[in-house]
């Protein structure tokens, strides 16, 4: 399945949440509310989830195979870093 679009909304706050992402597959299927989070070992991608009655969380949508997960994570982290670079460049130019 081909990733055809990745859109990042940068979150500027003191929290671990760094961005919220929408990803499109094959110009036909969209997944919203994927989160980019700063963890102890760097950035990671958290799939959209809902809170369960027991207090835990369950993914609403997620890849089944490791290679697809890697493809999604790599695309999202790359787009996130490009967004940060573009924002930094825009700040310098102002």
UniProtKB/Swiss-Prot annotation:
GO biological process: division septum assembly; sporulation resulting in formation of a cellular spore
InterPro entries: SpoVG (IPR007170), SpoVG_sf (IPR036751)
Keyword Oxidoreductase: no
This protein's UniProt keywords: Cell cycle, Cell division, Septation
Coiled coil: none
Function comment: Could be involved in septation.
Xref: NCBIfam families: PRK13259.1
Protein family: Belongs to the SpoVG family.
Listed name of the protein: Putative septation protein SpoVG
Species for this entry: Acholeplasma laidlawii (strain PG-8A)
């Amino acid at each position: 399945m081909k990733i055809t679009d990745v859109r990042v909304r940068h979150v500027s706050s003191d929290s671990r949440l760094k961005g919220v992402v929408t990803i499109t597959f094959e110009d036909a299927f969209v997944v919203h509310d994927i989160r980019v989070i700063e963890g102890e070992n760097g950035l990671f991608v958290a799939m959209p989830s809902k809170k369960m009655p027991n207090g835990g969380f369950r993914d609403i949508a997620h890849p089944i195979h490791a290679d697809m997960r890697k493809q999604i994570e790599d695309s999202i982290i790359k787009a996130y870093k490009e967004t940060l670079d573009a924002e930094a460049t825009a700040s310098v130019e102002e």
